[in-house]
UniProtKB/Swiss-Prot annotation:
The Q motif is unique to and characteristic of the DEAD box family of RNA helicases and controls ATP binding and hydrolysis. GO terms for molecular function: ATP binding; ATP hydrolysis activity; DNA helicase activity; DNA/RNA helicase activity; mRNA binding; RNA helicase activity. It comes from Saccharomyces cerevisiae (strain ATCC 204508 / S288c). This is ATP-dependent RNA helicase DBP9. ATP-binding RNA helicase involved in the biogenesis of 60S ribosomal subunits and is required for the normal formation of 25S and 5.8S rRNAs.
Amino acid sequence: MSYEKKSVEGAYIDDSTTFEAFHLDSRLLQAIKNIGFQYPTLIQSHAIPLALQQKRDIIAKAATGSGKTLAYLIPVIETILEYKKTIDNGEENGTLGIILVPTRELAQQVYNVLEKLVLYCSKDIRTLNISSDMSDSVLSTLLMDQPEIIVGTPGKLLDLLQTKINSISLNELKFLVVDEVDLVLTFGYQDDLNKIGEYLPLKKNLQTFLMSATLNDDIQALKQKFCRSPAILKFNDEEINKNQNKLLQYYVKVSEFDKFLLCYVIFKLNLIKGKTLIFVNNIDRGYRLKLVMEQFGIKSCILNSELPVNSRQHIVDQFNKNVYQLLIATDDTEYIKEEDDEIEEGHNTENQEEKSLEGEPENDKKPSKKKKVQVKKDKEYGVSRGVDFKNVACVLNFDLPTTAKSYVHRVGRTARGGKTGTAISFVVPLKEFGKHKPSMLQTAKKDERILSRIIKQQSKLGLELQPYKFDQKQVEAFRYRMEDGFRAVTQVAIREARVKELKQELLASEKLKRHFEENPKELQSLRHDKELHPARVQQHLKRVPDYLLPESARGNGTKVKFVPFHNAKKRHSHKKGRVSKPKNGKVDPLKNFK
């Protein structure tokens, strides 16, 4: 569940009660006020009393932006504060709460909210994000302090429990939280959770929270293992989504090359107002799109699993602060299990084909003997689900996802908390697939089939995907410029861009980390949307002449100027002055005297 200040609006607020009615610790109440909340949301007003007063386990299903994070953090913090009052100050209690999330990005996000809530009680409640980017020696030192609350991914926690015995004391554990539980299972953490259960004091009074935007049958196994007569909270979000989440969904049937052409026209002419999140299906596609956009002077930044964790978090933070208007995110997560209820039984073999497609190379060419960029990807990276992207006006599926469920996760980054948003998806018809090899993506072969499933899925929710209408003649006028710019972005240029970007981000992430901690203001000057320039940039492509613009957008004609290939001033400067300097450097002053 993502956290967003003042993003939860009317439909989710329960103004019939206040946080004071829960009889919380004064320090916790003050922290909640500092964050900016006066009334709890519906899920908070139901879950907090059940957890605090009745000590019930909680299984909750609620939409993104409904306040699930505070629904479990507040009871955890309040109970630990009460427990601290009953023990001696010098008594070691070990870890009291564990919060498990599917990705590193979500772990950092939850940890940031946790830090704000324990602002006035940090002496009593120490926190640690074990999935953050730190060395093993530093992590071991921090674990020696026995933090009361630990946030991390199941894989990282299991690794610590197995390899660093006694580094985490779970004898007095009181809380286990699994956030975005369906995604945790989808990422293949089922076995990790079972193994973690062997280290937990399940026979004691361990209180469990299982939180998610969707609940399915796979959660039953976790329910039986970790929960005791849980309270199951399900909120009917269909009416809320219809009335409040005004998400406009469009699709465009377009050829592979025309994806780049449409992107150029849309962003160069500012047809989308506000911040845009673009999803691509692999890392190379992200860099190709960025480099093509650079040809036309369109700035963007990249977010993918190769970048260091610190850089990824900084990119998300700056995007939320409106430093960037265009973010290209790689969503190359391989789902372990397909969970689309809408898919017919007869298409099971197709699902297997689609999953295998995600791992196939972009082209059908034989592997090159040339040395390729070999960078270790972060298995705990995830961007299409849970990450807190604020005020996203549009989600553009440059590459259509390989499952209908993944589509829901992507478009869920916009139209959150009752705000409006737009989702546009590029779909490659089967007859157009493979016609333009340089821009081809293997997963596009299944686009039409996936689109039909998405339409069917959304129709069950009362939502509709409409074809995106635009003037084809106006777009065709830009085609020759796109062909010119696209030709300059070669595979070699993409490889060089990836290497250059990694070097820049590693430098900023590792060597400057301590410097930026001491000088936080200088961190603001670190930008991630700088031009990479590994391709030949043609400056004349960065401006759009008036004759290409629609009549309504044209000026009075005085702004249109010819852009020469050579600098006229430099060419004529040699003609000025008839007297040239002799080779020996000596000049007769009398001959030049006037």
